[in-house]
Amino acid sequence: IYSLGKELYADVPGGLKKIKQMGYTNLELAGYKEGKIGGVDMMEFKKMVDDAGLKITSSHVNPPVREYTKANRSQISEYWKKTADDHAKLGVKYLIQPGQPSTRSTEETAFVCEIFNEAGKIVKAAGIPFGYHNHEMEFAKVNPGSTEAKLGRRVKGDCIYELFLKNTDPSLVFFEMDVYWAVMGQQDPIEWLKKYPNRIKVLHIKDRAILGESGMMNFENIFRQAYANGIKDYFVELEGMPDGRSQ
């Protein structure tokens, strides 16, 4: 529902019914904060979703800090405990972090992986799998002691996304690949799906604006590989709509 922005909250029941009429069946939430979704009580929001004949499958949530440190480690853990408990009441299938923490060096990235594993344990204890959603800068590269992640095929170093995959526990952390942002990170989503078939379990299907208009997204082959991997869940997202066009 991130795609719908303020348009949805102008008339939540009506907006949800329109989503159902379009043929969608499942929702991925966004806008969670202190027991509310976009300012609406979570259970009240769930009732409106149920009444529209839809199901809440996933939710995007971010801890209140972007830079992870030993000093705020416990704060992050407490956030996940509260967030997981709240979402367990909704019966979500996935709880996913869409915001990239600060990862400017190999060491900083390794610490983020530790925190991801801790979050995974907490969320798993509530009966929900914990996942991570990428943008383009996860495909940047870092080095030991570096102070900046750099994007580019000729840049030397370790790919942050690869480090995330290699240094998180598969039983605690899965990945939701945003195929558009992977392409913007100069990557082929299909190659990642082939390399990590058991780690990438959900997809974000997205284009520069309207799906299929840019000509840059190889959706047919992406879906072919995703289905071969056994991926069952994906979410359509729209961003950057031209003026005069509704989300």
List the predicted regions and their residue ranges.
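N-terminal pre-domain/capping segments
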Residues: 1-93
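Histidine-acidic metal/acid-base catalytic patches
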Residues: 1-3, 8-23, 91, 158-177, ...
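Acidic-and-aromatic substrate-binding clefts and catalytic sites of carbohydrate-active enzymes
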Residues: 4-10, 29-41, 63-77, 101-110, ...
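Active-site acidic/histidine proton-transfer and metal-coordination neighborhood
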Residues: 26, 69-174
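Conserved beta-strand positions in the central sheet of alpha/beta enzyme cores
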Residues: 28, 58-60, 96, 131, ...
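Short acidic, glycine/proline-enriched helix-loop-strand junctions
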Residues: 37-59, 107-108, 112, 116-119, ...
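Short amphipathic alpha-helices and their capping/turn segments at secondary-structure boundaries
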Residues: 41-50, 83-88, 117-121, 188-195, ...
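Short, hinge-like loop/turn segments at secondary-structure boundaries
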Residues: 45-47, 75-76, 113-114, 148-150, ...
